[in-house]
């Protein structure tokens, strides 16, 4: 298995120099799958299983949540796997990408974590709360704060909630917006942090299951998707790889190891 990891400066230089080709894939060309660290380990298991079945797959790991869609739209990768539909729709609206969900992956729990406090009642007035800074996942963080009873939001705003939609904030909490993949680092400094168990497990700094509150697995809009350009929907390599990801016992074991009980298979209903 071959895994390529791009840092932002390297990606920018490569794109500027035109080092990525946009040629159509050949039948025997490897399927290029873009992802981020949170989802890489189970995908690596799928890549290994695909190899056993004669399918060449190359995993391309990105360090941010912007480059995977840029690279997919440019044709540098064939599919990406890191985002749910609300995030995708926001990216399409912002950048004009012609990208579509192809198949569901997993849905992860997201929680509120605190190093200092054991309950929301213990949070002091003016407590600092770190949530994601992208438009969609910040809305998910605000929904969590509302579920915890720390704020109330305007009716019906859902995942599109912004700080302007906060109606009441009785503890006068101070909201800090941080890049989602960096939220785990805010655990030591903020009083309360929106946390993604997959990144917490990777960081190995605290227990991913120790959240004061999880958002539950009932919001299907947050299922992570395999995303493609529409023209690739009949690519047999893609169809086979997704089938392996969804049904291989080896991949399921890797998912269980990576996410514990804090995920659900989105293709299972």
Regions from the language model: what does each represent?
Residues 59-70, 157-185:
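Short helix-initiation/N-cap motifs at beta->coil->alpha
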Residues 61-65, 75, 79-89, 106, ...:
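Beta->alpha turn/N-cap motifs
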Residues 22-27:
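Sec/Tat signal peptide C-region and signal peptidase I cleavage site
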Residues 137-146, 245-266:
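Periplasmic-binding protein-like
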Residues 102-152, 252:
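A conserved helix-loop-strand patch within extracytoplasmic ligand-binding domains
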Residues 36-58:
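Short, polar/charged alpha-helical segment
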Residues 109-120, 222-237:
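A bilobed periplasmic-binding-protein/Venus flytrap-type ligand-binding module shared by bacterial periplasmic
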Residues 90-102, 115-117, 189, 194, ...:
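Ligand-binding "clamshell"
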């Amino acid at each position: 298995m071959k895994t390529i990891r791009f840092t932002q400066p390297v990606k920018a230089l490569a794109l500027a120099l035109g080092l990525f080709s946009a040629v159509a894939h050949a039948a025997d060309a490897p399927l290029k799958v873009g992802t981020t660290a949170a989802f890489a380990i189970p995908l690596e298991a799928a890549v290994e299983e695909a190899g056993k079945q004669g399918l060449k797959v190359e995993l391309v790991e990105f360090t941010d949540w912007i480059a995977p869609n840029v690279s997919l739209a440019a044709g540098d990768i064939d599919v990406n796997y890191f985002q749910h539909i609300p995030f995708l729709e926001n990216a399409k609206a912002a950048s004009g990408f012609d990208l579509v969900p192809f198949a569901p992956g997993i849905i992860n729990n997201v929680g509120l974590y605190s190093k200092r406090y054991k309950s929301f009642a213990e949070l002091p007035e003016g407590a600092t709360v770190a949530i994601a800074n992208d438009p969609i996942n910040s809305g998910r963080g605000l929904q969590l704060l509302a579920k915890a009873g720390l704020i109330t939001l305007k009716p019906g705003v859902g995942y599109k909630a912004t700080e302007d939609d906060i109606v009441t904030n009785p503890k006068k909490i101070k909201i800090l917006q941080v890049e989602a993949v960096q939220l785990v680092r805010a655990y030591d400094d903020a009083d309360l942090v929106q946390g993604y168990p997959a990144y917490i497990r990777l960081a190995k700094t605290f227990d991913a299951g120790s959240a004061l509150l999880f958002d539950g697995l009932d919001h299907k809009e947050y299922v992570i998707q395999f995303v493609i350009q529409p023209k690739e929907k009949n690519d047999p390599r893609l169809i086979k790889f997704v089938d392996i990801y969804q049904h291989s016992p080896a991949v399921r074991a890797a998912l269980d190891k990576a996410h514990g009980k804090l995920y659900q298979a989105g293709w299972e209903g």
